[in-house]
């Protein structure tokens, strides 16, 4: 069940290996700001940082802890592009705007590079990412992806690998080949999130934890954001709750929760591997996922643990299921111990298209990253900040993308997710 109010971090490898330990106070008195951000994950902190760099007074309200959600639990893979595929966006918004969307997707990685360097964020950032195919039909999809990226956008950072080339870097026999992207990469998500929080605070941003928002009212040209104990009065508000949008009252989300399907993803972390064993798994430091609908994703951590994740719909025997999945890929890890296992929701949309926009002229949102959140959240923070500062050109392009709704509330969403997972399992088995 989704819940975040007053929660502490889940125990995970990321939490135990965090390099900063912030404890921000709860909101106890009325505060005023230019912008109030609801949610202290990647998107909320990225937007706050962009605005603070421009001199805005920003307050961030977090119902739990900084990086409590996917920003502190994800696989840490920063992937450019979009899950839906840029060809669909050409149909929706035309070639010119689709080219702008593609360029923005490349900017997502530049933003990570820039912030890590500018604010000295220690988060084990490493370039290199491969999407792998389990059969020839899915390899054809990767071949087409590389062809379209090069032909339509001139992207030259992708390399097609056949099975022989892949085996030079990955110790698994189950794949027929892959598509390597030298620009995408991976990082320690919680340490990156905590680094963003420190950068925000250093620029004067106020962060309040354990301060879930219970109501929001627009009046007299301002927005009053209410917590259980106090309120923030601001000119503009940014909703940055992502997969937890359903938990908020309708007076806050105004129905945009219908765009989001929270899908549970699970990760295990092995004990530290010897260098020889680590090299037998991945020897070039890349992060990896397959191109199943319910995909496996994995990478080595800075201390040589294998972090292995998959999507599912049940937390029952999660560690055992993840271990079985891991051994299907890397049977050489049969005797390796699992030190950690944790789960968390991903904010998916029905068509995997990100949902960015405005509820009103003073209330902004971005969510629905659909597995691309490590990278896309930085871009979302930048373009929402641009809109608040008076330039909404890039936000307007995202507002033109079609994102279908799911009606019927959380019970229907849970049912739809479970049915969808079973359907995807069927497709993955037979396609």
UniProtKB/Swiss-Prot annotation:
Top EC category: oxidoreductase
Superkingdom assignment: Bacteria
Name of this chain's protein: Probable oxidoreductase OrdL
EC assignment: 1.-.-.-
InterPro entries linked to this entry: FAD-dep_OxRdtase, FAD/NAD-bd_sf
Leader sequence segment: none
Organism: Haemophilus influenzae (strain ATCC 51907 / DSM 11121 / KW20 / Rd)
Keywords (A to Z) from UniProt: NAD, Oxidoreductase
GO cellular component, one term: cytoplasm
Gene Ontology MF terms in the entry: oxidoreductase activity
């Amino acid at each position: 069940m989704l819940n975040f109010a007053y929660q502490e971090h889940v125990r995970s490898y990321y939490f135990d290996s965090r390099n900063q330990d912030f404890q921000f106070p709860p909101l106890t008195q009325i505060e005023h700001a230019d912008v109030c951000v609801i949610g202290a994950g990647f998107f909320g902190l990225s937007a706050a940082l962009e605005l603070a760099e421009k001199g805005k007074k920003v307050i961030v309200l977090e119902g739990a802890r900084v990086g409590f959600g996917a920003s502190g639990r994800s696989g840490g893979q920063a992937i450019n592009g979009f899950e839906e595929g840029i060809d669909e966006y050409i149909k929706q918004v035309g070639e010119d705007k689709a080219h702008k969307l593609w360029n923005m997707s490349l900017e997502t990685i530049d933003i990570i590079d820039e912030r890590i360097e500018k604010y000295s964020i220690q988060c084990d950032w490493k370039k290199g990412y491969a999407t792998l195919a389990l059969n020839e039909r899915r390899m054809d999809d990767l071949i087409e992806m590389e062809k379209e990226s090069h032909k339509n956008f001139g992207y030259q950072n992708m390399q097609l690998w056949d099975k022989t080339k892949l085996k030079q870097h990955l110790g698994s026999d189950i794949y027929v080949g892959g598509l390597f992207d030298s620009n995408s990469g991976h990082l320690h998500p919680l340490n990156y999130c905590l680094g963003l929080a420190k950068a925000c605070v250093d620029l004067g941003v106020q962060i309040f934890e354990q301060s879930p928002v219970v109501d929001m009212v627009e009046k007299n040209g301002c927005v009053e954001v209410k917590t259980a104990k106090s309120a923030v009065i601001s000119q503009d508000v940014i909703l940055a709750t992502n997969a937890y949008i359903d938990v908020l009252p309708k007076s806050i989300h105004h129905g945009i929760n219908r765009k989001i399907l929270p899908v549970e993803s699970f990760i295990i972390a092995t004990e530290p591997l010897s260098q020889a064993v680590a090299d037998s798994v991945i020897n070039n430091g890349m992060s990896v996922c397959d191109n199943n609908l319910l995909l496996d994703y994995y990478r080595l951590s800075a201390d040589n643990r294998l972090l292995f994740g998959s999507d599912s719909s049940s937390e029952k025997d999660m560690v055992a299921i993840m271990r079985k999945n891991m051994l299907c890929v890397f049977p050489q890890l049969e005797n390796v111990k699992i030190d950690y296992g944790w789960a968390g929701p991903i904010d998916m949309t029905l068509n995997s298209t990100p949902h960015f926009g405005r509820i009103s002229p003073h209330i902004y949102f971005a969510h629905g990253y659909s597995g691309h959140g490590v990278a896309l959240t930085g871009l979302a923070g930048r373009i929402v900040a641009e809109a608040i500062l008076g330039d909404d050109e890039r936000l307007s392009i995202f507002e033109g993308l079609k994102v279908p709704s799911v009606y019927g509330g959380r019970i229907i969403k849970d049912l739809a997710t479970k049915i969808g997972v079973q359907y995807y399992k069927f497709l993955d088995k037979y396609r």
